[in-house]
Amino acid sequence: MSELLLRLNFLLLLLLSCVSPSSFVTFNNPVVGLGACGPHQIQAFTQFKNEFNTRACNHSSPWNGVWCDNSTGAVTKIQFMACLSGTLKSNSSLFQFHELRSLLLIHNNFTSSSISSKFGMLNKLEVLFLSSSGFLGQVPFSFSNLSMLSALDLSDNELTGSLSFVRNLRKLRVLDVSYNHFSGILNPNSSLFELHHLTYLSLGSNSFTSSTLPYEFGNLNKLELLDVSSNSFFGQVPPTISNLTQLTELYLPLNDFTGSLPLVQNLTKLSILALFGNHFSGTIPSSLFTMPFLSYLSLKGNNLNGSIEVPNSSSSSRLESLYLGKNHFEGKILKPISKLINLKELDLSFLSTSYPIDLSLFSSFKSLLVLDLTGDWISQAGLSSDSYISLTLEALYMKQCNISDFPNILKSLPNLECIDVSNNRVSGKIPEWLWSLPRLSSVFIGDNLLTGFEGSSEILVNSSVQILVLDSNSLEGALPHLPLSIIYFSARYNRFKGDIPLSICNRSSLDVLDLRYNNFTGPIPPCLSNLLFLNLRKNNLEGSIPDTYFADAPLRSLDVGYNRLTGKLPRSLLNCSALQFLSVDHNGIEDTFPFYLKVLPKLQVLLLSSNKFYGPLSPPNQGSLGFPELRILEIAGNKLTGSLPQDFFVNWKASSLTMNEDQGLYMVYSKVVYGIYYLSYLATIDLQYKGLSMEQKWVLTSSATIDLSGNRLEGEIPESIGLLKALIALNLSNNAFTGHIPLSLANLVKIESLDLSSNQLSGTIPNGLGTLSFLAYVNVSHNQLNGEIPQGTQITGQPKSSFEGNAGLCGLPLQQRCFGTNAPPAHQFKEEEDEEQEQVLNWEGVAIGYGVGVLLGLAIAQLIASYKPEWLACLIKSRNR
């Protein structure tokens, strides 16, 4: 059972134990239940229900309803899961239920709602669950009035501030504030350490910090679960942790803890110990392998070294999951580990050992289900079919193991469900026997030297494979017919040619199809409207984009850029309400600008560059462009005309400096592949800079870019452009814009790349541009500008080519003097230009990331020219080992 399910069951059992005898009343009809609810309570409940959109409710669910006391008729419990949508206001009828003892409002949609101070009026509450419901801001201090609370769950919201609200909550047994934005230093005198009845405490995935984990945690000696994962704690774990003798689960991962592993030998009830992703050093105490109830141990990603000693008595160990990867152990570690015969999951990935791993040493693991040897040196002899590896094995990961032959060991594994041998040197053809493994569902063999398939084009059809990743090989010829069970298929960066087979239309379970960077020709099959993600970029496809998207089509991402497509943009895309990415750039599509797509509530990326779009870019109402979530707009190289209204940039997503901060670092969609692994979709961007085009992986969720260059736009640049504070790149070059450079550009505090060249702009360059500290590239050449060039560091560091073609400009870096200043020697500019060109040519090896100086600034400044989604098969442990 997963960690999440264990926790949920624990909380629900506690909740049920707090419910007093009462009558249940359905959501639809609060009058049933023998009239248990009083008339005033019925009226208040009806008012509360009407405050929200309840279309998502399962009205027959026993989890959604209200309970009333049999004797008084007062509402004592309200419970709604994944049901309510709207704003929970401070004048809500909810706060009329003064006899409430249990309130469960989880997985609802109270987006942009703060937690009202009125909750403090419900001072008889014993259980309060508000998790996963979109609450934001600080928890009001009035919570300290809820002195009867025994369980409080505020997890998975957008809450901030400190934990001062727990003062006076002395009866708390359960406190979960994980997955929020709580912060600050946990001081020894914090009210948290006065909650001596706590049995469950989760502070994970916040921003708490401390020079060391407070010793006072040792005072909470009734704790059964403690989670401080994914915070900013550092230093050594205090020895007082050994006082928590009731602990069954201890989570300290993804912090900056140092020193030796914490002393847990006294914690004899411990079943889960997660310490991964820290800086622990030294050796592993052998006593860890003899703890009587320990079943899960993750030490992955630390600085542990030395040998591993496992006592002979460990054969009776209950340890089932052991994660030791990414450490620096010495010697032959497999032999001692082989004594842990009850292991089901074993991670030895990226071990820095000087000895090859001999798979025959795994023969003692009779129940092994998952084995991860990614990044290890594997003995070639151990890959033969004579290996003694457990027949129970369900998942085997041998990525980046320098394997040159397809491992025949797989033949003898009838229960194998998931295999990863990607990023090796495997050559030749994929063996026919692979597709006969009866339970095989996920195959990752990308980034090898494979050239084809053994057998006929029908060889895959009857396979049980659901996920197949063949990326970055040398596969050629026609695409084989896919398995009938296929859900996810990626074969990007190969040499497949011919038509996309129509047999794909019979694969009703297919969600993801990624065939980009091949040599496919012919039309796009019209039957792909059921897909979630379709990527056909950089092939030789012809015809039009099929206009076959039905109502509520599930499409999230469509990329058909760099083909030979013609016709119009399909109007049926209006039916794709989940669409986030749309890229049709570099084709021959002839159409007007698709204003109609603004009804798509989730569209973030729109790439139409280098087509034949024509007509006005100004909206019909002469107002804002009106796309609610759009943040990357690339429409360069078309025939769009007209002027932009002053409100064109009003109400754009990029107006917020904190845009998408709650959505993680990268644009990503993940789904479970096998148990503890995920397959992730990551978006990518084509980076355009001075004629150079580079593909960059991992688009930041906080990136906002606009490229309107190479059209026929005219008139003034709207001052409303200054509202887009999250913008990092703006390209309006090669148009016919007139008037002054907007002063509001100085408000673009994140801007890194600004190109206004080849227009008809006049006046001076605003001094405010010189104060933009991230501005790494600016080009205003070939306009009608005059006056002195601002002398900020980011401006004077530009080459003179960025300002030439403006007869009235003067000052550095040009040679024209302003008010008697002397021009620097000519050879200085030559050196600057040579240096800049060298930087540009060296960009391809630069990773995405914010940095200092012109080189890194330029790299990040251009993280935007055109969106290009890419399917990547990422193996990420769900337990965040």
UniProtKB/Swiss-Prot annotation:
Question: What positions does the record give for glycosylation?
Answer: 58, 70, 91, 109, 145, 189, 243, 266, 305, 312, 402, 462, 506, 519, 575, 731, 779
For membrane topology, the record states: Single-pass type I membrane protein
Which intervals lie on the Extracellular side per UniProt?
Answer: 22-844
Q: List the stretches on the Cytoplasmic face of the membrane.
A: 866-881
Where the LRR repeats fall, as residue ranges, is 97-121, 122-145, 146-169, 170-195, 197-219, 220-244, 245-267, 268-291, 293-317, 319-340, 342-364, 365-390, 391-412, 413-437, 439-462, 463-486, 487-506, 507-528, 529-552, 554-576, 578-599, 600-624, 627-651, 701-724, 725-748, 749-772, 774-797
Task: Extract the signal peptide range.
Answer: 1-21
Q: Which locations, inside or outside the cell, does it occupy?
A: Cell membrane
Q: Which Gene3D superfamilies match?
A: Ribonuclease Inhibitor
Where is it found, in Gene Ontology cellular component terms? plasma membrane
Instruction: Extract the SMART domains matched here.
Output: LRR_TYP
Phenotype upon gene inactivation: Enhanced sensitivity to abscisic acid (ABA). RNAi mutants also display enhanced sensitivity to abscisic acid (ABA).
Q: Which family does it belong to?
A: Belongs to the RLP family.
Q: What is this protein called?
A: Receptor-like protein 41
Species of provenance: Arabidopsis thaliana (Mouse-ear cress)
